[in-house]
Structure formats: structure tokens, C-alpha cells
Regions:
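Extracellular modular ligand-binding repeats in secreted and cell-surface proteins
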Residues: 1-254
């Protein structure tokens, strides 16, 4: 880019071949601001007449995005809920030297990295409730003070199948009862709520510590991923014999 050519406006060329006339021409490198609004064509030659010359810079020089991904999987790595994704974008203006292709990041014409909408935070993410399973964390923590050089955030929440109340009895006449899967806590993916203890007529239920569980009661397991054995014992049976006079119909003795 021409600055001055050293050629006076009133100069007259002479006809003396033996005397040089000297002029000093001042040139400077042309500088072009580049940003997401005016990105030029990344990778294309700055000077179309020089296809092997300097190229316009890649977009990451002035436009960066930090990504967050939270995956929800079971113990085998199978997806159990939709991924959570988020992103924070940063932009700036750089200046490109049209002669060398150098990307200038400070000084006249440049701007510092700025977060879109001023957002530099990934909010905490509450883990979704997955029926029949519990998560190893109720939420992923917030990530604050992100900048253009921050690494992507990748989190994994692992789910484990919930346990059940398992009825059991050593009594040979025990009719059996269905297992009861622990209900999920709808407000916390890491917890279950108390499970209803099956009622079996003629039998009394006991928890693993031997405590009697009344009919219709509910039991809160200490570990939501472990089965709990509920032991049933036969109730003591009582009977009576009455003696009746066939003639009078009166009860003589009980």
C-alpha cells in the first residue's frame, strides 16, 4: 500500500542520460480487520493473483465456541436419557497482514475476546429421573468464568438399576408374594421412596433386622441399588371345640 512516492508535483524530467534522478517510494503492508461479521474467506488466498501466497486465517482465530456435553448412561455404557448440551461463544476482531498473512491480535484495529450476550457460565444441570434406575449424582456442577481458551466440558452421569423388596419364607405353605421394585423419587434422581410391603394373609412380615412390618406399611431401603429380603413367618393359629346337646341344641362346653 503506497504511503508516499517521493515525486514532487512540479518536477520536470531532464534529458541528461548521465545524471540519475532519485525518488524514494514509501510502502506499507496493508492490514485488514477480520471478525465473524467480516470473515473474508478462510483458507482462500489473500491476493487472488497469488494462489500460493498467504491465506485468510481460519475462523478459530476470531470465533471460538466452548461446548458442554453431559451424557447419561447405565453401568454398561448404554444411553438411558437424552444428552444435555450447551455452548458459550466468544468473538473478537483481529488484523491480518495482507503481505505476510500474519494474524495480529493486539494493537490498533483489534478487539479482545468477548462472550456472546456476556454469558461465561455453564449452569448446573439436574440429572433426569430414569424409571427403575438411580443416578450417581443429583446434578453436574456449574462451570463459571469460561474464556476463549477454556476446554470443552464433558461429564457422564451413571445410572444403576434399583433394587426390590423380595418376599421370603421358610414355611412350606407360604403362598409367595410378588417382588416390589423401589419407586423412584420424582424430585431426586439419586433416591428412591419407601416401597409398599406386600400383605400375605396369615403371615407377618419382618425386615432384615427382624422388626415387624405391619400390613400396608412401607419400607425405606438403606441402599437403593440393593435388594431387601422381607421374611414372612406364619401367624400362630388358635382353635376351639364346642360340645352341643343334639336334643336341646344347647352348647354344653367350649
Amino acid at each position: 500500500e503506497l504511503v508516499t512516492d517521493g515525486y514532487p508535483a512540479d518536477l520536470t524530467f531532464d534529458n541528461d542520460d548521465k545524471t540519475d534522478q532519485n525518488f524514494t517510494v514509501h510502502l506499507k503492508h496493508r492490514l485488514t480487520p477480520v471478525n465473524p461479521t467480516d470473515p473474508q474467506t478462510p483458507g482462500a488466498p489473500i491476493n487472488p493473483d497469488e494462489p500460493d501466497g498467504p491465506k485468510w486465517p481460519t475462523r478459530t482465530n476470531y470465533d471460538k465456541t466452548v461446548h458442554e456435553t453431559v451424557s447419561y448412561v447405565d453401568q454398561s455404557g448404554h444411553v438411558v436419557a437424552k444428552q444435555h448440551t450447551d455452548s458459550v461463544n466468544f468473538t473478537r476482531t483481529v488484523v491480518v497482514d495482507n503481505v505476510t498473512g500474519e494474524v495480529i491480535t493486539s494493537g490498533a484495529g483489534t478487539t479482545a475476546w468477548t462472550a456472546t450476550n456476556g454469558d461465561t457460565t455453564f449452569d448446573a444441570v439436574v440429572s433426569p429421573v430414569v424409571p427403575g434406575s438411580v443416578a450417581n449424582k443429583a446434578q453436574t456442577a456449574a462451570v463459571t468464568d469460561l474464556n476463549a481458551d477454556s476446554a470443552d466440558v464433558n461429564e457422564t452421569v451413571t445410572y444403576t438399576k434399583v433394587g426390590s423388596l423380595v418376599p421370603s419364607s421358610s414355611d412350606g405353605h407360604f403362598p409367595g408374594a410378588a417382588t416390589v421394585v423401589y419407586p423412584n423419587d420424582p424430585s431426586d434422581a439419586t433416591k428412591v421412596t419407601p416401597a409398599g410391603v406386600p400383605t400375605v394373609p396369615g403371615y407377618t412380615a419382618h425386615d432384615p433386622e427382624g422388626h415387624v412390618l405391619t400390613p400396608g406399611s412401607r419400607y425405606q431401603p438403606s441402599d437403593p441399588t440393593k435388594d431387601t429380603t422381607i421374611t414372612y413367618t406364619a401367624d400362630q393359629q388358635t382353635g376351639s371345640v364346642s360340645y352341643v346337646d343334639d336334643t336341646t341344641g344347647k352348647t354344653l362346653k367350649t
